[in-house]
Amino acid sequence: RVLFRSRLIAGLETPTEGSIQLERKVLWDPYQQVQAEERNIGFVFQDYALFPHLSVLENVMFGLKKIPKHERQSIAENALKHVSMSHHIYSYPHTLSGGEQQRVALARALAPKPHVLLMDEPFSNLDHRLRDQIRQSTIDILKQTSTTTIIVTHDPEEALQIADQIILMHQGKIIQSGTPKQLYFQPKTLFAARYFSDLNEIKTQIQDQQLHTIFGNIDIPKHLTSNNEIRCYFRPHQLRVNRIKTENSLAAKIISSNFLGYSQLLKLKIEAEDKVLSAYVEYSQHYDQADTVYLSLDLSQCFFYESNDSIEIHQSST
């Protein structure tokens, strides 16, 4: 659905209703339409869509048909220089790696100096070892050229790393928009919170204008005004694991431990509750399966939602 909207913006698909505007200029509405080739919008496809029978230089020149030929070559060569592909101008797509093809597709899209560049999952086809490197170099190029870019991705980590603004969509609707930090630390819905990380969940009880949890009590967040059941959510890294019992800590037994290199993912069963929680700890702490540990949690850093309404705004501190 998100990709379909990118194709609508580019003019590759026709809307059934509504309007599309760019810098207050109508690109499409029921009364007027600007054709795709007149919109000056670049598009980098997921599979790059390079022409196999054209050289790298010719692929980039292809999008510059309205410019005199001698100028086209100069512009294309400059675009390839920007993406560090000058040494491949006479190569053909089948001789290039996935990362090199991606850079050629980027050069072709940037050469006409588009008002907006659309990119569909541009890094998903790359080897995971090269993905971070190519992604960062692409973002650097886009910033150097001051190109406004809409990137479609289903990778939450990628969105947090590269975006200035994120628009999170679910079932065809915008759930939340804002900076990466706003969406991560202040998710307005349970869906938004879960999209960017795994969550632990515990029950609460309302008593004397407070929420009572197994980790202590906290004032009821002001945005939660109904009498519906409220649940507390928190990320695995927020759960503190210690070998020594402290105030408000709960005894738990490690039922599994997964080695992640720099950290461990622990599954913990709270002894006083029929509840299993997840926690990340540094591997240097050397926790083993069946160890007894003590858990504590800063409730002021948790998210609170009504159990039957994932639209409610959360309680969180940044």
Annotated model-derived regions:
Residues V2-L3:
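Short, small-residue-biased leader/transition segments that mark boundaries at the very start
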Residues E13-T14, Q21, K65, K143:
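A position-specific signal in ABC ATPase nucleotide-binding domains
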Residues T16-S19, Q171:
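Conserved coupling/switch loops of ABC nucleotide-binding domains, chiefly the family-specific signature
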Residues G18-D29:
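Conserved ABC transporter NBD signature motif
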Residues A36, N40-G42, Q46, L50-F191:
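ABC ATPase nucleotide-binding domains
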Residues F185-Q207, Y233:
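C-terminal boundary and immediately downstream tail of ABC-type ATPase nucleotide-binding domains
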Residues L199-E201, Q210-T318:
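Non-catalytic connector elements of ABC transporters
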